[in-house]
Amino acid sequence: MAAFENFLNVGQSLYNELKNICVWVKSNGGGMGSLYRSRHEMVCVFKIGKAPHINNVKLGKNGRNRTNVWEYPGVRANTPDSLELLKLHPTSKPVALLYDALLDASNINDIVLDCFGGSGSTLIAATRCKRRARIIEISPHYCDIILWRWEKETGKKASFVKNIGENSNEQ
């Protein structure tokens, strides 16, 4: 729990407002652990800037009936798709979870930032819901995996640039 508190404190020092803490309940069981296997992960939803936050849920007005408890299968070795993701990265997140979160709190062509790119699930989700993603990943190996997944998803070839300008519509 101390790690989550540290994460929350850092988030609160960087962002303007904590909008909610969501709980991802892994509907297919727990992940790693020792005494008790954790079947959930905490997701902090922060807002930055002075503009009103984006709320595409609107209490179900548009058919998006959402709560702060999100039930999605965890990525485990018991399905072919999950096994492929686990081979790429040990803590891959389901694209469907990220896709729904992006639909909830962003609009088409908005920029989405993921500072821990990992296996690239955020980039895939952003591509599917027409958001522009900015992904940061420290490991060159995982950067290659992210690019490979994006190329597989889009059928396009990634190109390397030194600087992506503010007006760019590239992923």
Language-model segments: which ranges?
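Core catalytic lobe of class I
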Residues: 1-143
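Short, structured secondary-structure boundary patches
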Residues: 38-44, 153-160
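Short, intrinsically disordered/low-complexity patches at protein termini
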Residues: 42, 146, 167-168
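Short linear sequence elements within intrinsically disordered, low-complexity coil regions
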Residues: 75-77, 147, 165
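Short alpha-helix adjacent to the SAM-binding motif of class I
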Residues: 141-152, 156
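SAM-dependent methyltransferase catalytic region
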Residues: 151, 157-171
